[in-house]
């Protein structure tokens, strides 16, 4: 999943902790990476494991986007275990 913060000033470590709290309600955090976008803005690429049978992607993304510092979020890829 790619998460784009509202501005370059957003503390990505604190944002990641908030994202992990949302992920906990659905599954398990795996790892993350930070990718530069433009003009000093960086995005979080977050990997997580969620049981396929209980996953509601729309609701999950809505919960991520409700985090104050999040400008946008999208799932980039999904695979089956």
Swiss-Prot record:
Molecular function in Gene Ontology: translation elongation factor activity
UniProt entry keywords in alphabetical sequence: Elongation factor, Protein biosynthesis
InterPro entries: eEF-1beta-like_sf, EF1B_bsu/dsu_GNE, Transl_elong_EF1B/ribsomal_bS6, Transl_elong_EF1B_B_arc
Pfam families, alphabetized: EF1_GNE (PF00736)
Function in brief: Promotes the exchange of GDP for GTP in EF-1-alpha/GDP, thus allowing the regeneration of EF-1-alpha/GTP that could then be used to form the ternary complex EF-1-alpha/GTP/AAtRNA.
Family under the similarity heading: Belongs to the EF-1-beta/EF-1-delta family.
Name by which UniProt lists this protein: Elongation factor 1-beta
Organism: Nanoarchaeum equitans (strain Kin4-M)
């Amino acid at each position: 999943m790619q998460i784009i913060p509202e501005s370059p000033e957003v503390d990505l470590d604190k944002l990641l902790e908030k994202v992990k709290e949302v992920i906990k309600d659905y599954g398990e955090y795996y790892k993350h990476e930070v990718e530069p976008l433009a003009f000093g803005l960086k995005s979080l690429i977050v990997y997580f494991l969620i049981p396929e049978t209980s996953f509601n992607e729309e609701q999950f993304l809505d919960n991520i986007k409700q985090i104050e510092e999040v400008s946008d979020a999208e799932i980039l890829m999904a695979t089956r275990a």
